[in-house]
């Protein structure tokens, strides 16, 4: 059921690619994302019913060039910095968190493709800038060697952004064991024609617009060029050398670590959603009165003023944390390892990822706290705040925040020289 859309408006893309100043390009992309907000709010009920982004919204994001942000310029992309990507995603999530999740988890993996896969397949896969890829790192399907490639079998759940994806990036179990007895895994880039998208999304508490369907491989043939043996997506990096993308395009962002970037990605989605929640809270402050005497407009009530102000500070703190940490990620990626004591190693990757997870949970706390005073009408099914609340609850229960305590322990072990395992 993969939906496909044609290339974006040529004039818009030509204009974007002609912009040489990164700040100017960022401003243009952020403005395009902001311009979509009212459309996203209006389309949110339809997106939940469809369980993914409605085609007319997907078209608008295509026309704005937003899916091309991480794709190399050599292959039709814009090749922006992650800090720019973050600002755009936050603006999209202000409109609707589910559709932001759908968008972000399909657009984000263009960065990883250049990082991990051989340059020989980049032109074909990026396809002039049309590349989108859902991803899931749990190795729940198998790859068996055959002449010229591999046969894939199995089901992968929670493939967020898959309805419009041209590819899937994930991990397959290989025959045999590693020397230490652990299972062998491979990094897989599977074109959309190798799998079936299952109609099994839309029954969770929230994020029903995220297009997080399962996919099924049924004796699918995968050419050998799309699989990297014994490469674990969780740890696969090039900190001791140069990645295919970094070598080909001279962009160090294609040479960095990505467990941190994934957690940061989820953090920036929740920041945008929290701003959307505060926006809805503010609209009700203007139109509603307090529930106790003297029954004044909420904007005039000292308690509601405090509720609003406290929430705004917490969200702003979360956004600043995300922005500043992305700049640190970029600095580590662009500084030669060891220069000035900078090493983008597993320790730095883990620490940066912890910031993203903490922001996720902090934003959930903000939305929960506002819910206590917004009023019961806001929790009516179909109301904007009700949808944001459900989406944020679903995000808080995501597997990534569940890594929090283990990651905290790793920080202490790393600092005190204690082996992680």
Place the predicted regions along the sequence by residue.
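N-terminal-proximal low-complexity accessory segments that begin disordered
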Residues: 13-17, 28-33, 42, 48-50, ...
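Generic structural signal for well-ordered, non-transmembrane alpha-helical segments
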Residues: 34, 268, 272-275, 279, ...
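C-terminal helix-coil-helix/basic helical segment that borders enzyme active sites and/or dimer interfaces
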Residues: 41, 45-48, 316-358, 368-376
């Amino acid at each position: 059921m993969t939906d496909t859309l044609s290339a974006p408006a040529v004039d818009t893309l030509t204009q974007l690619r002609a912009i040489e100043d990164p700040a100017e390009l960022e401003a243009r992309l952020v403005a395009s994302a902001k311009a979509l907000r009212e459309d996203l709010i209006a389309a949110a009920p339809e997106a939940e019913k469809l369980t993914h982004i409605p085609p007319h919204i997907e078209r608008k994001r295509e026309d704005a060039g937003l899916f091309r942000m991480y794709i190399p310029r050599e292959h039709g992309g814009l090749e922006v910095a992650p800090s720019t990507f973050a600002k755009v995603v936050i603006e999209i999530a202000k409109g609707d968190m589910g559709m932001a999740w759908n968008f972000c988890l399909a657009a984000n993996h263009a960065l990883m493709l250049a990082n991990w896969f051989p340059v020989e397949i980049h032109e074909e896969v990026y396809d002039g800038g049309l590349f989108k890829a859902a991803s899931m790192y749990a190795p729940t399907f198998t790859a068996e060697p055959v002449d010229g490639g591999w046969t894939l079998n199995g089901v992968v759940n929670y493939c967020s952004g898959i309805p419009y994806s041209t590819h899937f990036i994930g991990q397959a179990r290989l025959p045999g064991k590693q020397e230490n007895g652990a299972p062998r895994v491979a990094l897989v880039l599977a074109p959309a024609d190798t799998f079936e998208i299952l109609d099994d999304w839309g029954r969770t508490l929230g994020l029903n617009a995220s297009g997080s369907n399962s996919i099924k491989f049924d004796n699918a043939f995968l050419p050998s060029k799309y699989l990297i043996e014994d490469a674990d997506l969780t740890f696969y990096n090039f900190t001791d050398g140069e990645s295919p993308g970094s070598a080909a395009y001279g962009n160090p962002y294609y040479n960095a670590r990505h467990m941190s970037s994934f957690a940061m990605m989820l953090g920036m989605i929740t920041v945008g959603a929290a701003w959307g929640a505060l926006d809805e809270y503010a609209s009700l402050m203007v139109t509603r009165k307090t529930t106790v005497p003297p029954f004044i407009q909420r904007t005039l009530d000292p308690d509601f003023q405090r509720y609003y102000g406290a929430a705004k500070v917490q969200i702003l703190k979360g956004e600043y944390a995300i922005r500043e940490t992305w700049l640190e990620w970029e600095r580590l990626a662009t500084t030669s390892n060891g220069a000035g004591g900078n090493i983008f190693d597993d320790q730095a990757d883990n620490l940066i990822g912890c910031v993203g997870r903490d922001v996720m949970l902090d934003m959930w706390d903000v939305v929960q706290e506002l819910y206590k005073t917004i009023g019961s009408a806001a929790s009516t099914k179909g109301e904007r705040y009700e949808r944001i609340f459900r989406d944020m609850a679903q995000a808080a229960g995501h597997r990534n925040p569940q890594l929090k305590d283990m990651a905290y322990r790793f920080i202490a072990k790393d600092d005190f020289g204690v082996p992680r395992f």
